[in-house]
Curated annotation (Swiss-Prot):
Pfam families: PsbY. This is Photosystem II reaction center protein Y. The chain crosses the membrane at residues 4-24. InterPro entries: PSII_PsbY. It is a single-pass membrane protein. Its main location: membrane. HAMAP family: PSII_PsbY. Loosely associated component of the core of photosystem II (PSII), it is not always seen in crystals. PSII is a light-driven water plastoquinone oxidoreductase, using light energy to abstract electrons from H(2)O, generating a proton gradient subsequently used for ATP formation. It is found in: Cellular thylakoid membrane. It comes from Synechocystis sp. (strain ATCC 27184 / PCC 6803 / Kazusa). One of its GO terms (biological process) is photosynthesis. GO terms for molecular function: manganese ion binding. PSII is composed of 1 copy each of membrane proteins PsbA, PsbB, PsbC, PsbD, PsbE, PsbF, PsbH, PsbI, PsbJ, PsbK, PsbL, PsbM, PsbT, PsbX, PsbY, PsbZ, Psb30/Ycf12, peripheral proteins PsbO, CyanoQ (PsbQ), PsbU, PsbV and a large number of cofactors. It forms dimeric complexes.
Length: 39
């Protein structure tokens, strides 16, 4: 594999992972709030 592909893809992969973690954490928090209110 060409090293330039790795140079281009790795920041995108890091950004996508970071976004998924942040969105996932917010979604879990919101889901827990909704479930907590129903109980």
């Amino acid at each position: 594999m060409d090293w330039r592909v790795i140079v281009v893809v790795s920041p995108l992969l890091i950004a996508a992972t970071w976004a998924a973690i942040n969105i996932g954490a917010a979604a879990i928090r919101q889901l827990q709030d909704v479930l907590g209110r129903e109980a």
